[in-house]
Amino acid sequence: MSSARFDSSDRSAWYMGPVSRQEAQTRLQGQRHGMFLVRDSSTCPGDYVLSVSENSRVSHYIINSLPNRRFKIGDQEFDHLPALLEFYKIHYLDTTTLIEPAPRYPNPPMGSVSAPNLSTAEENLEYVRTLYDFPGNDAEDLPFKKGELLVIIEKPEEQWWSARNKDGRVGMIPVPYVEKLVRSSPHGKHGNRNSNSYGIPEPAHAYAQPQTTTPLPTVASTPGAAINPLPSTQNGPVFAKAIQKRVPCAYDKTALALEVGDIVKVTRMNINGQWEGEVNGRKGLFPFTHVKIFDPQNPDDNE
């Protein structure tokens, strides 16, 4: 195992703010095993994503901000993000530990300003997200599709601003067609982070899951009896009872909400701990730790 080469208390070294999934992918693809960055989640405002180069790919791990001001990744909880990073310095996510943060400026222009000046410039950038398609009416216009992110360069008129897109093209845009995005400070406190993100929402099912040391649940059995192995969905329906309430992020359309006592028909048991199931016609993913397998043929054994 390579030794970690970063200070987890230096937030500016590993926290990249509202970086999109695609930009994180670009920064980390082909980089050394264990290179990583932490960014704001564009799916659930207030949460974070740990993006890591591992096993010739880039993995993205969701970090949930809990109401008690703690942070959760997989089945592990931490008091703060530096503690989380310290843990994964010596524990594998999937095939790697965290070794070093990705460079904040992977491709600085040759002979241009230094990184400290770039940092100041980046902090002063103003971003907007496009609300509608705009084909452009004149040669000086900047066409865009709904959902793009643009950098504002100049505001020569009240209703028309000059902007640059991700490809570097510059042109005029109609102000009523966009909304401003307020950049959150990378040094701000957890409770004061801005809910906006510069990234386009990414599907929740695209997140990876770190290795877990939590044992898989087993079918409940009578005292003194042998514990039965986890049943297979190939042998017929498997049922579980929700033992913990689950209220998913409103933006996560793949997650299954649970109330304590709900009977879940388990349709698939993924090895990463995210199971698939159905409750009253609603289908989705849920953590196996939120349910307890039971045998509907022997209800007295399930108490």
Curated annotation (Swiss-Prot):
CDD domains: SH2_CRK_like, SH3_CRK_C, SH3_CRK_N. SMART domains: SH2 (SM00252), SH3 (SM00326). Keywords: Phosphoprotein, Repeat, SH2 domain, SH3 domain. Residues 184-204 are annotated as: Disordered. GO terms for molecular function: identical protein binding; phosphotyrosine residue binding; receptor tyrosine kinase binding; RNA polymerase II-specific DNA-binding transcription factor binding; signaling adaptor activity. InterPro entries: CRK_SH3_C, CRK_SH3_N, SH2, SH2_dom_sf, SH3-like_dom_sf, SH3_domain, Tyrosine-phos_adapter. Pfam families: SH2, SH3_1, SH3_2. Belongs to the CRK family. May mediate the transduction of intracellular signals. This is Crk-like protein. The gene is Crkl.
